[in-house]
Structure formats: C-alpha cells, structure tokens
C-alpha cells in the first residue's frame, strides 16, 4: 500500500485471501497505536491511512512477492502464527480445505495478546 504522503511510504502486508475467493485482496492490518505510556509517539502512518479509507477510495497495491508456498505432501502440516502474521496462514488453510479439499491433519495455533490458542490437544 502507498500512503498519500509528501514522501512515498511503502509497507509490506501479506495477503489473507486464497485464489478461489475471487478477484479481491484481503489484508490483516492492525492499526499501530503508540503504547499507553508513550502517547507522544506518532501512530503508524500506513495503518492509520488504511483505517481512514472509505468505500470507493483508491489505493495502489503491487505484488505478491513472497515465496511462502504449501509443500505438496500428504504429511501433517502445523501452522503457528500470531496477530496480523496470521494472514498468509489463513490463505494456506483456506486453500487446503476449500480448493484442494485436503484430508490431511492441519492443526493451527495462534497467539493473541500473549495467550496461545489452538486445538484442545495442545
């Protein structure tokens, strides 16, 4: 995403959607706010910009550029992620179950606010 700013600013965000979801781009973005005891700091430039957008606003997106692919195997896969870092994991998991109709075991675990969550066997 490119913020409308006198100086061009670029940020890398991971796509959260998978190809079967159609002609759209889904991103997981957390607005970067200053810590409570450091409110004099500026909020995140790009995340604040994204959260200020309204339906119909135009943005520029390029990519994808990453090399994070699903291994073509029948072995169990374990996904571990946290926060906005769950975006590419969501893409993989939805692709596995909605496109490939996988039957392999794919446990996924995520961390939010320092607490680990996942399947009961964890």
Sequence positions of predicted segments:
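Histidine-anchored nucleotide/phosphate-binding helix
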Residues: 15, 86-100
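Ferredoxin-reductase
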Residues: 1-55, 112-114
């Amino acid at each position: 995403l490119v913020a409308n700013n006198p100086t061009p600013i670029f940020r890398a965000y991971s796509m959260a959607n998978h190809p079967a979801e159609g002609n759209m781009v889904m991103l997981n973005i957390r607005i970067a706010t200053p810590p409570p005891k450091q409110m004099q700091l500026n909020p995140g430039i790009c995340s604040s910009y994204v959260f200020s957008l309204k339906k119909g606003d135009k943005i520029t997106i390029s990519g994808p550029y990453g090399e994070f692919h699903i291994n073509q195997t029948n072995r169990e896969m374990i996904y571990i992620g946290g926060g906005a870092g769950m975006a590419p994991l969501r893409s993989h998991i939805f692709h596995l179950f909605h496109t490939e109709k996988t039957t392999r075991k794919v446990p996924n675990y995520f961390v939010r606010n320092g607490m680990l969550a996942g399947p009961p066997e964890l």
